[in-house]
Amino acid sequence: MRAVIFGASGLLGRRMVRAFGDMTVTGTGFSRTAGALVAVDATSADAIARLLGRERPDIVVNCVGERRPAVWAGEPDRARAGNVDAARLIAKGARRCGARLVHISSDYVFDGMAPPYQPDSLPNPLNAYGRWKLTAEHAVRAACPDAAILRLPVLYGPVRFAAETNLTEIAHQVAAGAPVQLDDVCVRYPTHADEAAEVCRRLAEVLVKGKHLGSVAHWSAEQGLTKYQMAHLIARRFDLPAGHLRAGEADAAAGDRPVDARLDCHDLLAALGPVRHRLFDIEFPAVVEPWLTPAAPVRGRRKDRA
Ligand SMILES: NC(=O)c1ccc[n+]([C@@H]2O[C@H](COP(=O)([O-])OP(=O)(O)OC[C@H]3O[C@@H](n4cnc5c(N)ncnc54)[C@H](OP(=O)(O)O)[C@@H]3O)[C@@H](O)[C@H]2O)c1
């Protein structure tokens, strides 16, 4: 079996390549193409067609996205291209080469006012990122009607710079010791990128066997936490001072972040069978520990969505 993972240089894509490691897997990057990654501009239909024509995959996974708030605000054309145009072109390419497609989307398509959200709940994105993710879903469905759209909540996992995820950025703030206010209203469901990748792998298997699930699937960890609660968990686990941490409501007050966009996963669980949930309390220490030193690099090329 052959798989192509678009966006394999990113947080999720890197774990996806591992999860599909028993297949012949080709990963693409754009600005980061170290190792075996192939450089592909996903806003170029020709570049996508060339790659898919060469690799002839059974399954395509699209992890391309532009989730940096600085780009939504400052370079909307680029953010739209990375989120919407790339999604449409990859979906067209997958259909043309006869591969099944899993397209990664986000819980930010919901407004967070009435959780839990089912795959057929009415989306109502609050910010540009959520609107782009929703527009991308529509484009994918039109271009490749049998694609599976997998919506995920905020992810954590091994990172290359602290700001690559909310969790590692918060860990850095806890360790830095400077006064910091963290939102204590919006509830997130941090999900390990390896768990998301494993679910995607299982979903891909089901699709390749020719099964047709609903076009949208949800996956999420079960434990809900605010950023402030995550900070306290980190401080407690590593015996760090917590007096500089203040509970705030910045994300909620801004009005463009869902307060609670919990995704209901029962449909996908029924289709896949038992899936091992990775428990946040058990997983987070290994992920944050390397970032608890003030010397660790905070910013890399990419900045996490808020
Ligand atoms: N991270 C989260 O918390 C989260 C939560 C829910 C859903 N998602 C969704 O999951 C997907 C993956 O997210 P992520 O966190 O892994 O993102 P990420 O770390 O920012 O990685 C994004 C990937 O997209 C690639 N890319 C961006 N523009 C491209 C272009 N024009 N052509 C080709 N590749 C391009 C990047 O390549 P280079 O870096 O090499 O340029 C990178 O491989 C996205 O759809 C995102 O919206 C993420």
Model-derived features with residue positions:
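Amphipathic terminal alpha-helices
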Residues: R278-A306
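NAD(P)-cofactor binding segment of oxidoreductase domains
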Residues: G74-V102
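NAD(P)-dependent short-chain dehydrogenase/reductase
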Residues: R141-R188, E195, R201-R202
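Active-site Tyr-X1-5-Lys
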Residues: N124-A148
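NAD(P)H-binding glycine-rich loop region in Rossmannoid oxidoreductase-like domains
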Residues: A42-G82
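Mid/C-terminal beta-alpha module of Rossmann-like enzyme folds, strongest
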Residues: A197-A253, A295-R302
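Rossmann-fold cofactor-recognition segment
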Residues: F30-D46
